[in-house]
């Protein structure tokens, strides 16, 4: 469970760039953390992201097509990131690029999810 939350933090960094809070977000925090759980080893300083990690990143991006979805996912990720021990901010910021995903926002735990637009 702690690993899922840590992964979610990393995903949050990535998704907060893509997702934001909304009243009816289709993306649940469980989905966000579950999709990004395979990324935890990379997010905490491991070697490059695994294929399953990148598949989760792409799945999460596809699951958040609207501004509200992206903001909701972003907020879930920020919460999860706070629970990941030894989160490597550089690896979190590099995750989208390593997975060949383009996100027009900075990936960071300090990202303001409310500013994310679709």
Curated annotation (Swiss-Prot):
Q: What does this protein do?
A: Plant non-specific lipid-transfer proteins transfer phospholipids as well as galactolipids across membranes. May play a role in wax or cutin deposition in the cell walls of expanding epidermal cells and certain secretory tissues.
InterPro entries attached here? Bifun_inhib/LTP/seed_sf (IPR036312), Bifunc_inhib/LTP/seed_store (IPR016140), Plant_nsLTP (IPR000528)
UniProt keyword annotation of Manganese present: no
Q: Which SUPFAM superfamilies match?
A: Bifunctional inhibitor/lipid-transfer protein/seed storage 2S albumin
Q: What CDD domains does UniProt report for this protein, alphabetically?
A: nsLTP1
- Where does the record locate the signal sequence feature? 1-25
The set of disulfide-linked cysteines is: 29-76, 39-53, 54-99, 74-113
Stored PANTHER family: NON-SPECIFIC LIPID-TRANSFER PROTEIN 2-RELATED
Keywords, A to Z? Disulfide bond, Lipid-binding, Signal, Transport
Question: What name is this protein filed under?
Answer: Non-specific lipid-transfer protein 3
Molecular functions (GO terms): lipid binding
* Protein family membership: Belongs to the plant LTP family.
Q: Which Gene3D superfamilies match?
A: Plant lipid-transfer and hydrophobic proteins
At the top level, the lineage of the source is Eukaryota
- Pfam family example for this protein? Tryp_alpha_amyl
Q: Name one GO biological process term.
A: lipid transport
């Amino acid at each position: 469970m702690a690993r899922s939350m840590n992964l979610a933090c990393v995903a949050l960094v990535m998704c907060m760039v893509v997702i934001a809070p909304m009243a009816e977000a289709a993306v649940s925090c469980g989905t966000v953390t579950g999709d990004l759980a395979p990324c935890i080893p990379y997010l905490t300083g491991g070697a490059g992201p695994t294929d399953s990690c990148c598949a989760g990143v792409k799945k999460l991006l596809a699951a958040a097509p609207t501004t509200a979805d992206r903001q909701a996912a972003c907020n879930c990720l920020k919460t999860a990131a706070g629970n990941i021990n030894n989160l490597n901010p550089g690896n979190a910021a590099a995750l989208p690029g390593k997975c060949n995903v383009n996100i027009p926002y900075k990936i960071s735990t300090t990202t303001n999810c409310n500013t994310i637009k679709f």
